[in-house]
Amino acid sequence: MYVRRLRRERSNQAIADYLGSNGYTDALEAFRKEADMPNEIERKYGGLLEKKWTSVIRLQKKVMELEAKLSEAEKEAIEGAPTKAKRTPTDWIPRPPEKFALAGHRATVTRVVFHPVFSMMASASEDATIKIWDFETGEYERTLKGHTDSVQDLAFDSHGKLLASCSSDLSIKLWDFQQTFECVKTMHGHDHNVSSVSFVPAGDYLLSASRDKTIKMWEVATGYCVKTFTGHREWVRMVRVNVDGSLMASCSNDHSVRVWQTNSKECKAELREHENTVECIAWAPESAAAAINEAAGADNKKGAHQGPFLASGSRDKTIRVWDVNSGLCLFTLVGHDNWVRGIVFHPGGKYMLSASDDKTLRIWDLRNKRCMKTLYAHSHFCTSLDMHKSHPYVISGSVDTTVKVWECR
């Protein structure tokens, strides 16, 4: 009885403080009269109602997260998937709910990338800015300003000393990531929207792709364009360099993927099977070779494909995996309900991850050529994703203007 009365008195004091501090004087007088309260409110009750409400919201959020994790565990138990205790890092995949949902951009997030060394990530946006975040704490670090139109792509060099960005303002910028975080070089040369950038692994050259249908190679030290690759008949959407820097791949609105030798202007292969614009490409790591060969039905001892292997995602809603040497499409992954906007191979080599305009991230089992998990990631189109090479994290960006961090387990 006493405890109940004490709780009621404290609640009344907290409500009275809230009414008084927000200027609801008439309501406060009526409440005091109704509750038979003294005129003075003890100081310890200041802001108590709001604190209680915040605590309730925080607890509700925690309950929802725990329910999502419990649901995930139950689903795995029913489907017979490996439990957390039995999974090794090569099997870790992103699981709901997201660890962080980061807000700050004022328009569509176009690209998200991890820093190769530090616990940082960068996001580019149509609001013409680049934002830097700490992916382990979810803290906002800084904003890089300099572009005057939508920032389309980002790329760190292999040591993380430089960040390259490209924009609809026709420029490419290099940003110092050792000390100042300032723009140290701006390069001009494309005649239209610059849609993609990618460093050659050694870090001395940078490649860029544009709506002007060309790919350009730039010397990082001088900022001079040293080569221009021509061949695509429409907007070049993305360019990516393979692990040893000898080959680069590009994809285009002309429905094709082209593979080029970086030390010449020669087009090594033109890969044509997509039925719409090819939005994204990703080189397969060596760790994925066994899974890709098994999926392709090749005998690993006798008729195995040697690679290198390349994946491409398209507006035709499919992902295709190619043997670059033979030019063959080895298999196709079908499951997305809208454009495929981003793809990345799992470092362990067993899986591929994709982002799509159907608002999902999907995890694909390469050996079995099937979607093994779907994350309903964003409230609008998913535009980009990245997976860290050594830490258990995936990041995604969206038209909903948020960046999400997903923990792998």
Curated annotation (Swiss-Prot):
Keyword annotations of the record: Cell cycle, Cell division, Coiled coil, Cytoplasm, Cytoskeleton, Microtubule, Mitosis, Repeat, Transport, WD repeat
Taxonomic superkingdom: Eukaryota
Each WD repeat, start to end: 104-145, 146-185, 189-228, 231-270, 273-332, 335-374, 377-409
Pfam families: LisH_PAC1, WD40
Any GO BP: microtubule sliding
Example of a GO MF term: dynein complex binding
LisH domain sequence ranges: 7-39
CDD domains per the UniProt record, alphabetical: WD40
Subcellular location: Cytoplasm, Cytoskeleton; Cytoplasm, Cytoskeleton, Microtubule organizing center, Centrosome
Ranges in coiled-coil conformation: 54-81
Family matches, as SUPFAM superfamilies: Lissencephaly-1 protein (Lis-1, PAF-AH alpha) N-terminal domain, WD40 repeat-like
GO cellular component: centrosome; cytoplasm; microtubule; microtubule associated complex
Main location group: cytoplasm
Entry-linked Gene3D superfamilies: 1.20.960.30, YVTN repeat-like/Quinoprotein amine dehydrogenase
Stored InterPro entries: Dynein_regulator_LIS1, G-protein_beta_WD-40_rep, LIS1_N, LisH, PAC1-like_LisH-like_dom, WD40/YVTN_repeat-like_dom_sf, WD40_repeat_CS, WD40_repeat_dom_sf
Family that this chain belongs to: Belongs to the WD repeat LIS1/nudF family.
Role this protein plays: Positively regulates the activity of the minus-end directed microtubule motor protein dynein. May enhance dynein-mediated microtubule sliding by targeting dynein to the microtubule plus end. Required for several dynein- and microtubule-dependent processes.
Domain notes: Dimerization mediated by the LisH domain may be required to activate dynein.
The protein, known as: Lissencephaly-1 homolog
Biological source species: Aedes aegypti (Yellowfever mosquito)
